[in-house]
Amino acid sequence: MAITKEDILNAVAEMSVMDVCDLVKMMEDKFGVSAAAAVAVAAGPVAGPVEAAEEKTEFDVVLVDAGSNKIAAIKAVRGATGLGLKEAKDAVEGTPFTVKEAASKEEAEALKKQLEEAGAKVELK
């Protein structure tokens, strides 16, 4: 006997919220889709450029310059990326270097602060 949609719905209804989140993530990975809801935009008046731009949610943390204390910058890059000593040294000396891609705003700000405390110059893109 085949499993019906109703059987699946009942099984999901009995799951905890964490289990449902894990299930959604697994489905996204398996089928290569995103569970983000599609939002329809209402047509507004045809005017000049949009005044309130959508706030960016993902940032790339880019090391622009290591600064005067390369050793501290290398340590900070190693801590942030998990790179080995040679790879981190090459990254710091070969700036610009993308330390982290698609980081959340909070994570990007924290990483930027950590790298700047080590004397590096960092940009969020």
From Swiss-Prot:
GO biological process terms, semicolon-separated: translation
Keyword Ribonucleoprotein belongs to the record: yes
InterPro entries: Ribosomal_bL12, Ribosomal_bL12_C, Ribosomal_bL12_C/ClpS-like, Ribosomal_bL12_oligo, Ribosomal_bL12_oligo_N_sf
Molecular function GO terms recorded: mRNA binding; structural constituent of ribosome
Keywords, in A-Z order: Ribonucleoprotein, Ribosomal protein
Any one annotated GO CC term: cytosolic large ribosomal subunit
Pfam families documented for this protein: Ribosomal_L12 (PF00542), Ribosomal_L12_N (PF16320)
Superkingdom of source: Bacteria
NCBIfam families assigned to the protein according to its UniProt record, in alphabetical order: L12
Subunit structure, interactors included: Homodimer. Part of the ribosomal stalk of the 50S ribosomal subunit. Forms a multimeric L10(L12)X complex, where L10 forms an elongated spine to which 2 to 4 L12 dimers bind in a sequential fashion. Binds GTP-bound translation factors.
HAMAP family with a match to the protein in the record: Ribosomal_bL12
Protein purpose: Forms part of the ribosomal stalk which helps the ribosome interact with GTP-bound translation factors. Is thus essential for accurate translation.
Family membership: Belongs to the bacterial ribosomal protein bL12 family.
The protein, known as: Large ribosomal subunit protein bL12
Organism this protein belongs to: Francisella tularensis subsp. holarctica (strain LVS)
Gene name as annotated: rplL
